[in-house]
């Protein structure tokens, strides 16, 4: 795998980086699913991308492909019929085609403008049938491509935050204290409030404490523990 990332890989990174369009991933079966993941990784790290199912493409979805887009077609064998049907239309449209395959001598390998070689000696499947090793290698190649472009684009954590506002990653990068606060739920009493008013405010807001305000500024804090200690020391409280 390491040996397959060389000069052509650098050319592919530059081709995508300099492109004015998006990256369109295509494939079928398990290779198609890997294409979806690579498209998602590219999009979330600063390189606009989408996934186009090879079968759907020849049934109308080619309309989402622009001439300026770069195509990455994924097929272990390089001879999937759906890929063979699709590639001529993409070439006719003027798109640059990058083939990701374990078979450089295949249809895809020969028809591609650039090749991402993903060599596989044997699948992890005991019968050497189910795509396992091959899809892992494809995934690694896709991640290498995404991270290289991310670095080249100068993509920073603040950029990631803008397009990933949800989830734990989004919260870590994007969430601020102000996003979690609700002024209507903050317990607050004036400095002239009675003890009963303080107790009612703490009970209503259920935070175990209340801030004390004076002239619009916080002048103190009263907790339920403070109230208990006052009650223990004083018999007559108003």
Segments the model singles out, each with a brief description of its role:
Residues 1-5, 48-51, 74-77, 186-189:
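Short, flexible loop segments at the rims of nucleotide/cofactor-binding pockets, characterized by
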Residues 1-18:
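An N-terminal, well-structured beta->alpha segment
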Residues 8-12, 57-61, 197-198:
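Short acidic active-site motifs
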Residues 22-28, 32-140, 144-149:
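Glycine-rich phosphate-binding loops that contact phosphosugars or nucleotide phosphates
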Residues 156-185, 219-238:
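Tandem CBS (Bateman) regulatory domains
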Residues 188-206, 231:
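The conserved cystathionine-beta-synthase
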Residues 213, 218-219:
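Short hydrophobic beta-strand segments in globular cytosolic domains
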């Amino acid at each position: 795998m390491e040996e397959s990332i060389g000069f052509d890989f650098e050319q592919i990174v530059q081709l995508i980086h300099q492109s004015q369009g998006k990256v369109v991933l295509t494939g079928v079966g398990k290779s198609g699913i890997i294409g979806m993941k690579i498209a998602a990784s590219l999009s979330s790290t600063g390189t606009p991308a989408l996934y186009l199912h090879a079968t759907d493409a020849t049934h109308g979805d080619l309309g989402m492909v622009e001439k300026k887009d770069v195509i990455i077609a994924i097929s272990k064998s390089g001879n999937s019929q759906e890929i063979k049907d699709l590639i001529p239309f993409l070439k006719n449209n003027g798109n640059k085609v990058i083939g990701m395959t374990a078979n450089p001598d295949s249809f895809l390998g020969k028809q591609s403008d650039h090749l991402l070689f993903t060599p596989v000696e044997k699948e992890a499947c005991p019968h050497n049938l189910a795509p396992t090793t091959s899809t892992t290698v494809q995934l690694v190649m896709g991640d290498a491509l995404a991270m290289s472009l991310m670095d080249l684009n100068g993509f920073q954590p603040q950029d990631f935050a803008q397009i990933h506002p949800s989830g734990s990653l989004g919260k870590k990068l994007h969430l601020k204290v102000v996003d979690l606060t609700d002024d209507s739920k903050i317990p607050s009493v004036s400095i002239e409030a009675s003890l009963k008013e303080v107790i009612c405010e703490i009970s209503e807001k259920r935070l175990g404490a209340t801030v004390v305000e004076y002239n619009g500024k916080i002048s103190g804090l009263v907790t339920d523990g403070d109230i208990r200690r006052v009650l223990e020391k004083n018999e007559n409280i108003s």
